């Protein structure tokens, strides 16, 4: 990409922000993770509708195909403008696992909803008595035919009250050493 192409892209990003980052949305963004789901979804939808929601995803799964410089331009411009943070759990954590390791059925079921923001995810790592010491996880997933039965607790789960789904680390092998047997 030439420097004039990058300059044009930067102008496009600034114009987009000027059009979609309203004063009320900018004020809501100052709350960080405290932003309401409705406000978070409004910004997510605007970025999604522009085709810019997943700059780190492969194009075949809905990514932008941007260069590192384009990603930097977008990231810097939205941060400097005080735009809401796109909730990272689906786009940055769950989506890449699904498009890399998921079945075609899982990709079809989850990736479009992560991209369009209609489903929000949260992470389930910390547990009572173990905090973020993942080797001491007690929540277990026990195989029951084709399914797993999960039993345990998670705490300190950022945005759990706004999420539709949780991705959780669970112990699937109780015989393994503590650092292993976690899925």
Language-model features, listed with the residues they occupy:
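Short, solvent-exposed loop/turn elements at beta->coil junctions and helix N-caps
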Residues: 60, 126-130, 155-156
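Amphipathic, small/basic residue-rich leader segments at the start of a protein or domain
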Residues: 1-88, 99, 105-116
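Short, conserved phosphate-binding/catalytic loop or strand-edge motifs used
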Residues: 90-95
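A structural signal for short hydrophobic beta-strand segments in well-ordered beta-sheet cores
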Residues: 139-142
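Active-site-adjacent elements of ketosynthase-type condensing enzymes
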Residues: 129-137
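Flexible, glycine-rich active-site loops centered on histidine and acidic residues
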Residues: 96-101, 123
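A short core secondary-structure module
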Residues: 147, 151-183
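A short, Trp-centered hydrophobic/proline-enriched beta-strand micro-motif
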Residues: 117-125, 169
């Amino acid at each position: 990409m030439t420097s004039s192409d990058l300059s044009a892209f930067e102008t496009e990003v600034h114009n987009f922000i000027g059009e979609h980052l309203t004063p009320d949305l900018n004020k809501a963004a100052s709350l960080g993770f405290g932003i309401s789901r409705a406000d978070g979804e409004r910004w997510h939808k605007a970025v999604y509708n522009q085709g810019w929601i997943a700059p780190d995803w492969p194009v075949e799964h809905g990514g932008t195909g941007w260069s590192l410089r384009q990603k930097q331009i977008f990231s810097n411009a939205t941060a400097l403008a005080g735009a809401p943070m796109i909730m990272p759990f689906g786009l940055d954590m769950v989506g890449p696992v699904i498009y890399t390791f998921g079945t075609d059925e899982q990709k079809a079921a989850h990736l479009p909803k992560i991209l369009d923001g209609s489903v929000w995810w949260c992470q389930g790592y910390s547990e009572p008595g173990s905090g973020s010491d993942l080797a001491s996880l007690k929540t277990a997933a026990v195989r029951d035919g084709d399914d797993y039965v999960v039993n345990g607790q998670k705490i300190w789960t950022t945005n759990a009250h706004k999420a539709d789904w949780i991705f959780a680390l669970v112990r699937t092998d109780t015989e393994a050493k503590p650092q292993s047997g976690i899925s």
